[in-house]
């Protein structure tokens, strides 16, 4: 039995047509019990996990003991009228602002927590 080198294999594959390469890949998948598609999907999933979140939602979890102060803080932050702000606060948990940057979300959270609200950033 003669030994085939990697270079000889590469030259042989380079001489194949696209259809022949597809058939070769299928035969290799069957022979070795692997799937080429599963290997290709791995790095893409890892790249998505690395992305940092840039837009946040500020959620009023509860208004705590001082509902009036929280309503005032919500009005100041959102520009809503008194009735709309009151309805929003009373419907907690509720999204106050969507798609804001991290600094704005942190600032809004701080001002609402100072008024007595429980706030989450998602």
UniProtKB/Swiss-Prot annotation:
<comment type="similarity">
    <text>Belongs to the bacterial ribosomal protein bL12 family.</text>
</comment>
<protein>
    <recommendedName>
        <fullName>Large ribosomal subunit protein bL12</fullName>
    </recommendedName>
</protein>
<comment type="subunit">
    <text>Homodimer. Part of the ribosomal stalk of the 50S ribosomal subunit. Forms a multimeric L10(L12)X complex, where L10 forms an elongated spine to which 2 to 4 L12 dimers bind in a sequential fashion. Binds GTP-bound translation factors.</text>
</comment>
<dbReference type="Pfam" id="PF00542">
    <property type="entry name" value="Ribosomal_L12"/>
</dbReference>
<dbReference type="GO" id="GO:0003729">
    <property type="term" value="F:mRNA binding"/>
</dbReference>
<dbReference type="GO" id="GO:0022625">
    <property type="term" value="C:cytosolic large ribosomal subunit"/>
</dbReference>
<dbReference type="InterPro" id="IPR000206">
    <property type="entry name" value="Ribosomal_bL12"/>
</dbReference>
<dbReference type="Pfam" id="PF16320">
    <property type="entry name" value="Ribosomal_L12_N"/>
</dbReference>
<dbReference type="InterPro" id="IPR036235">
    <property type="entry name" value="Ribosomal_bL12_oligo_N_sf"/>
</dbReference>
<keyword id="KW-0687">Ribonucleoprotein</keyword>
<keyword id="KW-0689">Ribosomal protein</keyword>
<dbReference type="GO" id="GO:0003735">
    <property type="term" value="F:structural constituent of ribosome"/>
</dbReference>
<dbReference type="GO" id="GO:0006412">
    <property type="term" value="P:translation"/>
</dbReference>
<comment type="function">
    <text>Forms part of the ribosomal stalk which helps the ribosome interact with GTP-bound translation factors. Is thus essential for accurate translation.</text>
</comment>
<dbReference type="InterPro" id="IPR013823">
    <property type="entry name" value="Ribosomal_bL12_C"/>
</dbReference>
<dbReference type="InterPro" id="IPR008932">
    <property type="entry name" value="Ribosomal_bL12_oligo"/>
</dbReference>
<dbReference type="InterPro" id="IPR014719">
    <property type="entry name" value="Ribosomal_bL12_C/ClpS-like"/>
</dbReference>
């Amino acid at each position: 039995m003669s030994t085939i080198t990697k270079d000889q294999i590469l030259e042989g594959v380079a001489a194949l047509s696209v259809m022949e390469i597809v058939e070769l890949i299928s035969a290799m998948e069957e022979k070795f019990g692997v799937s080429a598609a599963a290997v290709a999907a791995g790095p893409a999933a890892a790249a998505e996990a690395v992305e940092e979140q840039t837009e946040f939602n500020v959620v009023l979890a509860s208004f705590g003991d001082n509902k009036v102060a929280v309503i005032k803080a919500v009005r100041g932050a959102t520009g809503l009228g008194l009735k709309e702000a009151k309805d929003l606060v009373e419907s907690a948990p509720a999204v106050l602002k969507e798609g804001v940057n991290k600094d704005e979300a942190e600032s809004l959270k701080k001002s609402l927590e100072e008024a007595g609200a429980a706030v989450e950033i998602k």
